[in-house]
Amino acid sequence: MTTPSMEDYIEQIYMLIEEKGYARVSDIAEALAVHPSSVTKMVQKLDKDEYLIYEKYRGLILTPKGKKIGKRLVYRHELLEQFLRIIGVDEEKIYDDVEGIEHHLSWNSIDRIGDLVQFFEESDERSVQLKAIQKKNEQTNQES
């Protein structure tokens, strides 16, 4: 079982490897805004739990288990960003909101949000209807 902190590291490592082909402790530390020694400790724990293989001074690679969860975590993050865009959350708030909620949702909830995103993507009319409801509610709230 992973903790939210472990998930943040696995997600970041997965993204770095996808983007650059590798992930170094210094890259992870910079991306997560943490001290390299904190990264080393977590990487050692993730190695022990078989999410990755870490060799000091040589770098790290994700195991199949680590790749699988990394891919799923990136999907979750991107899906939640997409969902918040669809429902009209201000762009500058989306990243922080996703970071605040992603670890607190079950995978069942994530799958249902995925269904809802698909529902809106399948018909532009649905998004138009949602925006009309939001506009009406904003006007009602301003009048109150």
From Swiss-Prot:
User: What is stated about the way this protein's activity is regulated?
Assistant: DNA binding is strongly activated by Mn(2+).
Give every HTH dtxR-type domain span.
1-63
Would I find Glycoprotein among this entry's keywords? no
Q: Give a GO biological-process term.
A: intracellular manganese ion homeostasis
Q: Which residues participate in Mn(2+) 2 binding?
A: E11, H77, E99, E102
Query: What's a single GO CC term here?
Result: cytoplasm
MF terms in GO: DNA binding; DNA-binding transcription factor activity; manganese ion binding; protein dimerization activity
Q: Which domain of life is it from?
A: Bacteria
Task: Identify the PROSITE patterns for this entry.
Answer: HTH_DTXR
SUPFAM superfamilies given in the database record? Iron-dependent repressor protein, dimerization domain (SSF47979), Winged helix' DNA-binding domain (SSF46785)
Q: Where does Mn(2+) 1 bind?
A: D8, E99, E102, H103
* Cellular compartments annotated: Cytoplasm
Q: InterPro entries, per this entry?
A: DtxR_MntR_Metal-Reg (IPR050536), Fe_dep_repressor (IPR001367), Fe_dep_repressor_sf (IPR036421), HTH_DTXR (IPR022687), HTH_tscrpt_reg_MntR (IPR022897), Iron_dep_repressor (IPR022689), WH-like_DNA-bd_sf (IPR036388), WH_DNA-bd_sf (IPR036390)
Among its keywords, does the record have Metal-binding? yes
Instruction: Name the family.
Output: Belongs to the DtxR/MntR family.
In terms of NCBIfam families, this protein maps to: PRK03902.1
Which PANTHER family would you find in this protein's record? Answer: IRON (METAL) DEPENDENT REPRESSOR, DTXR FAMILY, TRANSCRIPTIONAL REGULATOR MNTR
Give the protein's biological function: Central regulator of manganese homeostasis.
Q: What is the designated name of this protein?
A: HTH-type transcriptional regulator MntR
